[in-house]
Amino acid sequence: MKKRVVLFSLLTLALSGVARADDAAIKQTLNRLGLQSAEVKDSPIGGMKTVLTENGVLYITEDGKHLLQGPLYDVSGKTPVNVTNHILNERLDALKDQMIVYKAPQEKHVITVFTDITCGYCHKLHEQMKDYNALGITVRYLAYPRQGMNSQAAKDMQSIWCVADRNKAFDAAMKGDDVSPATCKTDIGAHYQLGVLFGVQGTPAIVLDDGTVVPGYQPPKEMMAMLDAHKASLKSGG
């Protein structure tokens, strides 16, 4: 029994050494490209790793010599599936406590919306919140100031996310009320950065539960039909 434990320990050390060696080559390449803060994760492609950067998702060979820019699609099913966004769902889950949520009484679908309080179609979506909720659609908001993190919209949304009643503050802002300055540990910069990784180009940007991103506004009934069809597609294998 002791021999087995020793052999297992040696094997574990050997494998971890290989993993460190692979990551070392990758990190050396990333450092050379000015991507020191990038996060390296496993990839669904053999011999490659996923790299999460401030500007998007990349894929790099384990020897650090070849680099591809995402997204990556699985085309083995009936329709292409964005594998990259499946990976990003982990980061989305980590922000659950920071989301401003409008929960449906009889929930059938959950969508996460990257929003901007200065966006016309974001206002239109929010004005119909009762209709979305009545159909069984729960809406979760993350902040995505289209003009960047130095914009006034970013400062206002940061304040909204820092008050005790975020829903009330968000409702007021969407009605055109002035936003009172507030500060806290919550950083909507993390929301914005995740939006960049998801490839968000404008708002509203809707993320489905499997990581699929649907750009733009959709009326409640059309949204419900799309969500039902998407769910049925996933059940049938894509």
Curated annotation (Swiss-Prot):
Stretches of the chain forming a coiled coil according to its record: none
Keywords: Disulfide bond, Periplasm, Redox-active center, Signal
SS bonds (residue pairs): C119-C122
Domain Thioredoxin intervals: 61-232
A single GO cellular-component term on record: periplasmic space
Domain of life assignment: Bacteria
Pfam families: DsbC_N, Thioredoxin_2
InterPro entries (UniProt xref): DiS-bond_Isoase_DsbC/G, DiS-bond_isomerase_DsbC/G_N, DiS-bond_isomerase_DsbC/G_N_sf, Thiol:disulfide_interchange, Thioredoxin-like_fold, Thioredoxin-like_sf, Thioredoxin_CS, Thioredoxin_domain
Protein family: Belongs to the thioredoxin family. DsbC subfamily.
Segment forming the signal sequence: 1-21
Annotated protein name in UniProt: Thiol:disulfide interchange protein DsbC
Major location category of this protein: periplasm
Gene name of the encoded protein: dsbC
UniProt-recorded Gene Ontology molecular function terms: disulfide oxidoreductase activity
Function: Required for disulfide bond formation in some periplasmic proteins. Acts by transferring its disulfide bond to other proteins and is reduced in the process. DsbC is reoxidized by a yet uncharacterized protein. Also acts as a disulfide isomerase.
Quaternary structure note: Homodimer.
Cellular localisation: Periplasm
